[in-house]
Swiss-Prot record:
It is found in: Cytoplasm; Nucleus. Disulfide bonds: none annotated. GO terms for biological process: chondrocyte hypertrophy; energy homeostasis; regulation of fat cell differentiation. One of its GO terms (molecular function) is ubiquitin protein ligase activity. Highest levels found in fetal brain and testis. Also expressed in thymus, salivary gland and uterus. Highly expressed in cells of the innate immune system, in particular activated NK cells. Week expression in the intestine. Interacts with USP7, which antagonizes the ability to degrade mRNA. Residues 16-37 have a biased composition (Pro residues). The gene is MEX3C. InterPro entries: KH-I_MEX3_rpt1, KH-I_MEX3_rpt2, KH_dom, KH_dom_type_1, KH_dom_type_1_sf, MEX3, Znf_RING, Znf_RING/FYVE/PHD. It catalyses: S-ubiquitinyl-[E2 ubiquitin-conjugating enzyme]-L-cysteine + [acceptor protein]-L-lysine = [E2 ubiquitin-conjugating enzyme]-L-cysteine + N(6)-ubiquitinyl-[acceptor protein]-L-lysine. Its EC number is 2.3.2.27. This is RNA-binding E3 ubiquitin-protein ligase MEX3C. Residues 104-137 have a biased composition (Acidic residues).
């Protein structure tokens, strides 16, 4: 018995390696012949059939995935019972041994136990095979091909349409990468019209040949992008830091526009570094940016060269003019009004240049506030007057030439000195029809608050000011010329910032006159005592020719008149001229070299420009000019067409100023 039991155990243990899973994908098992049709199985063949029956592999008919596991116990029991009935005791016994019923019973028991173990093993094997099949399906490389292509390893897409397939990185080895490269070759260069396409995930481009596949797919595109994205850097030097500031512009506006235009990055030099721009970008863009920078630098160099040529020479004297007949004068203004004269974006100074046909160089921030005006002498004088009048109108800073006049404080009166100025005043040349000028403005001292210039540029064309200190308009002295310009009502009605031309008539004014103040001779009294009539109309005893109109107004009074000129008497207005000094209402020093002195505090108190009695306490709305007392302001508003005497703007009301 022991020997029979050990033999039965050996037979049972012999087919133990059979339940191992087949390599994926598992080959279909060959169909087993039915028990009745085939020959009788003996020994190991019978046990193999029993094991296959236990696994449910003996049924060639298609079944559901879970059916073999469900029918495995019943099939195993039926097979064992049938075979036990068919086999004789001799067949169940091992060869060469006598029949042993106990061994047969032990063998049946062991077969039942092995059947149960096989059932469990079959379930586990089936689950493992399903999981492996799913993994194989997921990790396999899918090649999309037209329906005509038949391959056992390809998956057909209905209709031959190409779709996007996402593959995981698992099990994506070099062999599959090579297959993908081959598929790409078919797609981009094959004879098939529809082609094949391999789809791979980006994270699958890892080790195992995937990098080579990606390079094969995108090699040409990457090379093209590299050729297009090659950048170059070039340094563009400019002459000076001033050129850098000009090219960069205010708050970098110009350099930003250049960057956008050329599609480059331009690094600007900082203060203290060499004036070199560093341009980075494509080669053609860098070349265009370099041309733009060098062109702007050359343009600025030309402008600066012209400024240096026309600018002031050493010693503060005027430079020689560019062309024959041209001259350059300097107009000094306070620091605080430089921007006012220049205007927003240079609009004011450009307008003055266009109106006067001159070239005006504005002062830089680190230099004296002196405007350099170049042009013909008469145009230069017009431009100077425009600048002065613009400051006067915008700031309201006037100086009254009354008994405490400018010459009394600044020393010698230039109009009574010998030399060029005196000869100009005493010349017998006729007065040309020209713009009005103030002779007191032109002092040849470097400390002049109105600038300095050459004397011949002022009087080279025999031009005389018509409201100079000795003009009949000053109402305090007499005229030294042979002729007097005739002023009519049509001339007074013109409202212009620059004083209009006055027609000339041959009317002599050497008639008897009564000077208010005695004259002690030319040059003997350095300070001519100029008296200005404070109130009332023309003096009772005329100091001018009787043919001169009684209704004459001062030319500057045209800016502050309120009524049209008529034949009646008008209120005599004193001479008001702007003060261009820093903090003091004084004029420049005279030719004698004496320094300017500040007027007393009483000079700083402004009186009404209409009545000259009351203090200025009213302003007109909407223009805002505060040059009137409340009584005169109300009179202006009560007129039929109320308008500001200064700017001729329509007035709606007058308001009182509390200061």
């Amino acid at each position: 018995m022991p020997s029979g039991s050990s033999a039965a155990l050996a037979l049972a243990a012999a087919p133990a390696p059979l339940p191992q899973p087949p390599p994926p994908p598992p080959p279909p098992p060959p169909p087993l012949p039915p028990p009745s049709g085939g020959p009788e199985l003996e020994g190991d063949g019978l046990l193999l059939r029993e094991r296959l029956a236990a696994l449910g592999l003996d049924d060639p008919s298609p079944a559901e995935p879970g059916a073999p596991a469900l029918r495995a116990p019943a099939a195993a029991a039926q097979g064992q019972a049938r075979r036990a009935a068919e086999l004789s005791p001799e067949e169940r016994a091992p060869p060469g041994r006598p029949g042993a019923p106990e061994a047969a019973e032990l063998e049946l028991e062991e077969d039942e136990e092995e059947g149960e173990e096989a059932e469990l093993d079959g379930d586990l094997l089936e689950e493992e095979e399903l999981e492996e099949a799913e993994e194989e399906d997921r990790s396999s490389l899918l090649l999309l091909s037209p329906p005509a292509a038949t391959a056992s390893q390809t998956q057909q897409i209905p209709g031959g349409s190409l779709g996007s397939v996402l593959l995981p990185a698992a099990r994506f080895d070099a062999r599959e990468a090579a297959a993908a490269a081959a598929a790409a070759g078919v797609l981009y260069g094959g004879d098939d019209a529809q082609g094949m396409m391999a789809a791979m995930l980006s994270h699958a481009y890892g080790p195992g040949g995937c990098g080579a596949a990606a390079a094969a797919l995108n090699g040409e595109q990457a090379a093209l992008l590299r050729r297009k994205s090659v950048n170059t850097t070039e340094c563009v030097p400019v002459p000076s830091s001033e050129h850098v500031a000009e090219i960069v512009g205010r708050q970098g506006c110009k350099i930003k526009a250049l960057r956008a235009k050329t599609n480059t990055y331009i690094k600007t030099p900082v203060r203290g570094e060499e004036p070199i721009f560093v341009v980075t970008g494509r080669k053609e863009d860098v070349a265009m940016a370099k041309r733009e920078i060098l062109s702007a630098a050359e343009h600025f160099s030309m402008i600066r060269a012209s400024r240096n040529k026309n600018g002031p020479a050493l010693g503060g004297l005027s430079c020689s003019p560019n062309l024959p007949g041209q001259t350059t004068v300097q107009v000094r203004v306070p620091y605080r009004v430089v921007g006012l004269v220049v205007g927003p974006k240079g609009a004011t100074i450009k307008r003055i240049q266009q109106q006067t046909h001159t070239y005006i160089v504005t002062p830089s921030r680190d230099k004296e506030p002196v405007f350099e005006v170049t042009g013909m002498p008469e145009n230069v004088d017009r431009a100077r007057e425009e600048i002065e009048m613009h400051i006067a109108m915008r700031t309201g800073n006037y100086i009254e030439l009354n008994e405490e006049n400018d010459f009394h404080y600044n020393g010698t009166d230039v109009s009574f000195e010998g030399g060029t100025l005196g000869s100009a005043w005493l010349s017998s040349n006729p007065v040309p029809p020209s713009r009005a000028r103030m002779i007191s403005n032109y002092r040849n001292d470097s400390s002049s608050s109105l600038g300095s210039g050459s004397t011949d540029s002022y009087f080279g064309s025999n031009r005389l000011a018509d409201f100079s200190p000795t003009s009949p308009f000053s109402t305090g002295n007499f005229w030294f010329g042979d002729t007097l310009p005739s002023v009519g009502s049509e001339d007074l009605a013109v409202d212009s910032p620059a004083f209009d031309s006055l027609p000339t008539s041959a009317q002599t004014i050497w008639t008897p006159f009564e000077p208010v103040n005695p004259l002690s001779g030319f040059g003997s009294d350095p300070s001519g005592n100029m008296k200005t009539q404070r109130r009332g109309s023309q003096p009772s005893t005329p100091r001018l020719s009787p043919t001169f109109p009684e209704s004459i107004e001062h030319p500057l009074a045209r800016r502050v008149r309120s009524d049209p000129p008529s034949t009646g008497n008008h209120v005599g207005l004193p001479i008001y001229i702007p003060a261009f000094s820093n903090g003091t209402n004084s004029y420049s020093s005279s030719n004698g070299g004496s320094t300017s002195s500040s007027p007393p505090e009483s000079r700083r108190k402004h009186d009404c420009v209409i009545c000259f009695e009351n203090e200025v306490i009213a302003a007109l709305v909407p223009c805002g000019h505060n040059l009137f007392c409340m009584e005169c302001a109300n009179k202006i508003c009560e007129k039929r067409t109320p308008s500001c005497p200064v700017c001729q703007t329509a007035v709606t009301q007058a308001i009182q100023i509390h200061s």
